């Protein structure tokens, strides 16, 4: 294919074309020799793991008060701010709020990241965070009705995790996953705990490693992470990646989506899938300049940061 000087494809479009071309070349080479149905199916399966799993069509966006995480139980949306929890109906009406969420915590915290909701409980990734450095990580559980604190999971320092930016529940394996925004070793892994016992199980090395991971969510056998890897100053989009985790010590990372439809490029945060509608929900911030995870003024035309939940219809893609 050819590119003109006036067209610059996004990373997502470029990777799709490259991988589809590779798949076509490989399939063509296989076609000159006998190929069983099983071999063809195995080949398609191999290439499908390099490509996005779904096509995403933007439905709409609703403004919310929180800037960190989004979760849904199918009836409500739960949104986290750095120091607050909010509950919305699906029209965007605020139902409840808890602006003192750390009350009852054994270890003081000042920051909540991405969240999840499961069986009437909100799973909160909490810590002390300042200028790109996190400490005192906690896995806190809040009541989904009242948003009040209930209990904590024990964090395992020997895991090597130095910061927590998001948390999710694997409904199939009954485990809890956490991600880290901080780079170097901590940000190269996802960390798994038992949902039933709270015991730390393992960490999984990501290949390649996404930059500045903000949120994580489990959906139909895969983990999805958001990465604040686009440079807002240059109008670059952030991205969503898919991770097919197995029992191994490492997992391949696939580009799932580029966030090109947002009103203005800024900072991607948490994500989830509404279990009733199968719509992907992505929290995105715009207007504020973010340096090392902290707000440092505003872009021209803004005097405050705007937080929005983008809702996407998902259609599974099939490699024929």
Please report, for each region that a protein language model flagged, where it lies by residue:
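A short helix->beta-strand "capping" segment at the edge of beta-propeller domains
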Residues: 39-65
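A short beta-strand motif characteristic of beta-propeller blades
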Residues: 52-62, 94-106, 148-157, 199-206, ...
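Beta-strand-rich domains and repeat architectures in extracellular enzymes and scaffolds
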Residues: 56-83, 111
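Repeated scaffold domains used in trafficking and secretory/extracellular systems
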Residues: 64-71, 106-116, 158-169, 209-217, ...
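Short loop/turn segments immediately following the C-termini of beta-strands
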Residues: 82, 127-129, 181-183, 228-231, ...
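Structural motif
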Residues: 85-88, 131-140, 185-192, 232-243, ...
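Blade-loop segments of beta-propeller domains
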Residues: 94-129
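Loop/turn-rich, solvent-exposed surfaces of beta-rich toroidal or solenoidal domains
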Residues: 208-249
